[in-house]
Design a protein with these regions (language model features):
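Conserved glycine-rich cofactor-binding loop
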Residues: 17-19
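The beta1-alpha1 cofactor-binding region of Rossmann-like NAD(H)/NADP(H)-dependent oxidoreductases
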Residues: 63-74, 107
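Substrate-binding pocket helix/loop in short-chain dehydrogenase/reductase
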Residues: 100-102, 109-114
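Active-site helix of classical SDR
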Residues: 125, 163
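Alpha-helical segment proximal to the catalytic Tyr-Lys
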Residues: 130, 176-177
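Residue(s) in the substrate-gating loop at a strand-loop-helix junction
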Residues: 147
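C-terminal helical subdomain
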Residues: 187-188, 207-253
Length: 255
């Protein structure tokens, strides 16, 4: 929680209209941050803002398509105009793809997943870095949303798995290249939080051995608190990688 003698820190959350992004945005607001809510669709973003209750006055809704460089530039320009700086980027926006064999995956679907999960994350990180280097005081923190799929794939998930492995490379490169500018970069790898994206797990999901089984899920609030705790560290300390998951979910080798 921020103290009264400190100006509120500024966080930007992509994919803030639903799921993990919404939960993290609400947690930041509850901890006293000013929060920029970014996502493709205005209505879910507005629902997130309203859900913040008394904290909603510190939320700014900015509809954004992270796959478009101009849209991302406008997002960060609006953040700077409204708040003058950026302390934390939660680089969260992402999407999956239908579970099909590799040879049946349309290249258009592959490109859409890469555009959102990797290029979109790069564009947001790039814009955040430019702002964090220019602001006074300099620096800030970037937290990238990885996945258990950054460690081990699910069956028929090549596009999602490949992009999440690539996010790990993005995190490492940002950490190396930007640490001397006061910018810390870490990654949180999340497994089976209760969101719309994981609803299918309650009905059963394909396993590596070919069976279909229900998988346990955890409260998304645990993820939100973990991200906010990562963000709360001073910039001379960094959680480089964190894995948070439902305790009994399949993980190593997805077994």
């Amino acid at each position: 929680m921020q103290t009264n003698d400190q100006p509120p820190k500024v966080a930007l959350v992509t994919g803030a209209g639903t799921g993990i992004g919404r939960a993290v945005a609400l947690e930041f607001l509850a901890r006293g941050y000013r929060v920029v809510l970014a996502g493709r669709r205005p209505e879910p973003l507005e629902h997130t803002r309203v859900a913040a209750g008394d904290d909603s006055a510190r939320a700014l809704v900015v509809p954004t398509d992270v796959t478009r460089e101009t849209s991302v530039r406008e997002l960060f320009d609006e953040t700077q105009r409204a708040y003058g700086r950026l302390d934390v980027l939660f680089n969260n926006a992402g999407r999956g793809a239908p579970a099909v064999p590799i040879e049946e995956l349309p290249v258009e679907t592959w490109r859409e997943v890469v555009d959102t999960n990797l290029t979109g994350m790069f564009l947001c990180a790039q814009a955040a870095i430019r702002l964090m280097k220019a602001q006074n005081p300099r620096g800030g923190r970037i937290i990238n949303n990885g996945s258990i799929s950054a460690h081990a794939p699910r069956p028929y998930s090549i596009a999602y798995t490949a992009t999440k492995h690539a996010v790990t490379g993005l995190t490492k490169s940002i950490s190396l290249d930007c640490r001397n500018d006061g910018i810390a970069c870490g990654q949180i790898d999340i497994g089976n939080a209760v969101t719309e994206m994981t609803d299918r797990m309650a009905a059963g999901i394909l396993q590596a051995d070919g069976s279909t089984r229900v998988e346990p899920r955890m409260d998304v609030g645990h993820v939100a608190k973990a991200v906010a705790d990562m963000a709360a560290l001073p910039l001379d300390a960094n959680v480089q990688f964190m894995t948070i998951m439902a305790t009994t979910m399949p993980f190593v080798g997805r077994g």
